[in-house]
Amino acid sequence: TMGATQALDIVSRALLQPGDPVMVEEPGWAVEYARLAAMGMRVLPVPRGPEGPDMAVMQRYCETMAPKLYVSVSVLHNPTGYTLSAASAHEVLQMAQRYGFYVVEDDTYCHIAPDHAPRVTVLDRLQRSIYVSGFAKVLVPNWRLGYLAAPPELVERLLDTKLLSTLSTPTPMEQALALCMEQGQLRRHAERLRQHLAQARTRSVALAQAAGCRFVAEP
């Protein structure tokens, strides 16, 4: 896809109709919520805490609004930096199974996130979940390349929507990315970037704590 943003747009266009309720995280990425609202969706904010979403609020929406999707940045949440706990991930998936909505996992920061962080789609094995990610955060911002993975029964609808939208993604960019992956350059670059960010995070936390700041959750 043309970045993770287009992947999210494809999911919305393929699976939703104007007026459909969609659960989103509060706070969260304002661009995604504005896009959903512009498409005529009913945006349902779910408070996001250090461990995950407010399950009581989700339960209430499920019982009264019958949401179609729950859009979540589960790892390195924007803007809080929270990472979904394994227990919360299981709770979300159980609710998705019970009420029939899909969890859209926006894993934009996957290349710089901790390896041990739980992913909803890994736990779920793409039954009630859709995985979205991209490469702009780790390679070049102007390389708008992304991808999505979805349950088999949704793939054809998503592919048709992609073809009707942009037909294809620029081939030279795809080939350059494929070469980076085949030669191991992407993996090595991501490892160096994670090390650099870990050092910067440690210094930043120490400076903030020395200045009297405290954190609700570990950055």
In which residue ranges do the predicted regions lie?
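Short, surface-exposed, low-complexity cationic segments
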Residues: P67, F215-V216
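Short basic/aromatic active-site micro-motif
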Residues: M2, E218-P219
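A structural motif corresponding to the C-terminal end of an alpha-helix
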Residues: M95-G100, L207-A211
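Conserved core of the PLP fold type I
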Residues: T1-Y99, H111-L126, L197
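Short, conserved active-site loop motifs that form the nucleotide-linked donor/cofactor pocket
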Residues: F101, S129, C213
